[in-house]
A protein has these predicted regions:
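C-terminal and inter-domain tail/linker signature
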Residues: 1-187
Length: 187
């Protein structure tokens, strides 16, 4: 993401995918990813570059869908089982979730839950409890939404099972860049 002031870039945010570099170099020190490791393709609709003009109303509507989905997802595990997330309300049943290196790809809601969400929440069940200490910014344009935050997640690593990281009982912060494509009201 780039921040512009007076037609100049004043800030640039990027995540260096060091795990991917380590994998390419054959120096991966952790257990294999739970999901499939491979490149992240462009959007299935092949319309990832959105020409102008900017449609603010559509962009705001798309952002709101993502915010509603994230709000529902944060209900679990503190407010009940997986059903409180209402994932079928927001996610297409055949969606693809492309995680970073070390996590991998999940196909469909069950793939996302099995290969990323369940291990992640088991290891850090206090997800979503420190919203007053995080920052995030949403961007929406037509059917695409992105969010970045530095940090936008704070959790405590209390259990094992996620990327082979030992449960040290330490709070960790995470920076992320997440992108979503919406089709017919579903992610």
């Amino acid at each position: 993401f780039y921040q512009f002031e007076e037609n100049r870039v004043v800030e640039f945010q990027a995540l260096w995918d060091l795990p991917e570099v380590m994998m390419q170099a054959g120096a991966w020190p952790m257990p294999p990813s739970l999901g499939r490791e491979w490149h992240v393709p462009g959007p299935a609709t092949q319309d990832g570059l959105v020409p102008g003009p900017y449609d603010e109303e559509h962009g705001l509507k798309s952002c709101q869908l993502i915010i509603d989905m994230l709000t529902a997802m944060k209900r679990h595990p503190s407010q009940g089982g997986p059903e409180v997330m209402e994932m079928e309300k927001y996610w297409h049943p055949r969606m693809s979730w492309y995680g970073p290196s070390g996590i991998g790809t999940g196909r469909g809601i069950s793939g996302f839950r099995n290969w990323h969400q369940i291990p992640f929440l088991n290891a850090m069940p206090d997800r979503g409890q420190y919203v007053d200490q995080i920052n995030y910014h949403f961007f929406g344009d037509r059917n695409y939404v992105a969010v970045t935050g530095w940090p936008n997640m704070i959790q405590t690593l209390t259990h094992d099972g996620w990327m082979g990281i030992a449960p040290a009982g330490k709070r960790v912060t995470m920076r992320s860049l997440d992108f979503w494509r919406i089709e017919k009201g579903l992610i």
